[in-house]
From Swiss-Prot:
Keyword Cell membrane: yes
GO CC terms in record: plasma membrane
Lipid bilayer topology: Single-pass membrane protein
Name of the featured protein: Uncharacterized protein SAOUHSC_02783
Keywords: Cell membrane, Membrane, Transmembrane, Transmembrane helix
UniProt key word Cell membrane: yes
InterPro entries: Csa, Csa_sf
Cellular location(s): Cell membrane
Family: Belongs to the staphylococcal tandem lipoprotein family.
Spans traversing the lipid bilayer: 7-27
Length: 264
């Protein structure tokens, strides 16, 4: 009888320990997931910034990587990648470096085509067209091969100018992951074609699929903030071995000395 009571007590103790450990793990996971969401929300608050000149007066996260007196540089990047079945992958996008010290903005528009070389290995053929930004207008700084490209560049809009995530907290069934070894973190949501941001992308790009995209928010570095880390977002419409259609965007705040770029 005494042995039976001890056995029962032992089993109850083990179950209690399991419940406590499970509760601690669940609480820690929920807390980290909430922190990941909050980290992304801090970046998504920038959307929309319709006038890019406003970035001259915006300050992002600063750490010891910034030198005294450096106001920092914003890097904005938007690009659309389309690889239809049986065709080459083409990427069109733009990168701007918005220097808060000099209140000047330079960058480039690029067109990249992924083909195979004579040995069947992937080859990335990219052309860059230098631009500057004045009074929220994109201006090519070198002659362009045709008026169509000139118009395409001058009319280009970054996703941060029209994207809006005011309803991000209403997104359902988010898949949140965290890798402490890098560290890296992400959040993935299945969208529908009625989503505002999806409609805006379809309005601006000829997206050759009716399939609704997944929204993937990606980040690396310290969750509390770091000028070394990065955050980006991706709308993935199609992703497989034969076909790829996705849109990527990022807005980064970095020390000005880390923003050297090249255009050809």
């Amino acid at each position: 009888m005494i042995h039976s009571k001890k056995l029962t007590l032992g089993i109850c103790l083990v179950l209690l320990i399991i419940l406590i450990v499970g509760y601690v793990i669940m609480t820690k996971t929920n807390g980290r997931n909430a922190q990941i969401k909050d980290t992304f929300n801090q970046t998504l608050k920038l959307y929309p910034t319709k006038n890019l000149d406003d970035f001259y007066d915006k300050e992002g996260f600063r750490d010891q990587e910034f030198k005294k007196g450096d106001k920092g540089t914003w890097i904005v990047n938007s690009e659309m990648v389309i690889e239809p079945k049986g065709k080459d992958m083409e990427t069109r996008g733009m990168v701007l470096y918005i220097n808060r010290n000099t209140r000047t903005t330079k960058g480039y528009y690029f067109i990249s085509e992924m083909t195979d070389d004579s040995n069947g290995r992937p080859k990335d053929d990219e052309k860059r067209y230098p631009v500057k930004m004045e009074h929220n207008k994109i201006i090519p700084t070198k002659p362009l091969p045709n008026d169509k490209l000139k118009k395409e560049i001058e009319n280009f809009k970054f996703f941060v100018q029209y994207g809006n995530f005011k309803d991000i907290n209403d997104y359902k069934d988010g898949d949140i992951s965290y890798n402490p070894n890098v560290p890296s973190y992400s959040a993935k949501y299945q969208l529908n074609n009625d989503d505002y941001n999806v409609q805006q992308l379809r309005k601006r790009y000829d997206i050759p699929t009716k399939q609704a995209p997944k929204l993937l928010l990606k980040g690396d570095g310290d969750l509390k903030g770091s000028s070394v880390g990065s955050r980006s977002l991706e709308f993935t419409f199609v992703e497989n071995k034969e076909e790829n259609i996705y849109f990527t965007d990022s807005v980064q705040y970095t020390p000005s000395e880390d923003t050297r770029y090249e255009s050809n």
